[in-house]
């Protein structure tokens, strides 16, 4: 299980999870705003 550059891979993984977290927060914000404004 040796990879050429494990540090780069972990950074890519963290960035991807960060984007998913921001997307989830955005979706929740839209749902809550729709709930409160209706």
Curated annotation (Swiss-Prot):
The keyword Signal does not apply. It is a single-pass membrane protein. One of its GO terms (cellular component) is photosystem II reaction center. Keywords: Chloroplast, Membrane, Photosynthesis, Photosystem II, Plastid, Reaction center, Thylakoid, Transmembrane, Transmembrane helix. The chain crosses the membrane at residues 17-37. GO terms for biological process: photosynthesis. The keyword Translocase does not apply. It is found in: Plastid, Chloroplast thylakoid membrane. It holds the Pfam family PsbL. PSII is composed of 1 copy each of membrane proteins PsbA, PsbB, PsbC, PsbD, PsbE, PsbF, PsbH, PsbI, PsbJ, PsbK, PsbL, PsbM, PsbT, PsbX, PsbY, PsbZ, Psb30/Ycf12, at least 3 peripheral proteins of the oxygen-evolving complex and a large number of cofactors. It forms dimeric complexes. One of the components of the core complex of photosystem II (PSII). PSII is a light-driven water:plastoquinone oxidoreductase that uses light energy to abstract electrons from H(2)O, generating O(2) and a proton gradient subsequently used for ATP formation. It consists of a core antenna complex that captures photons, and an electron transfer chain that converts photonic excitation into a charge separation. This subunit is found at the monomer-monomer interface and is required for correct PSII assembly and/or dimerization. Belongs to the PsbL family. This is Photosystem II reaction center protein L. It comes from Huperzia lucidula.
């Amino acid at each position: 299980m040796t990879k050429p550059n494990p540090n780069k891979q972990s950074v890519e993984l963290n960035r991807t999870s960060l984007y998913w977290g921001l997307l989830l927060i955005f979706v929740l914000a839209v749902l809550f705003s729709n709930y409160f404004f209706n």
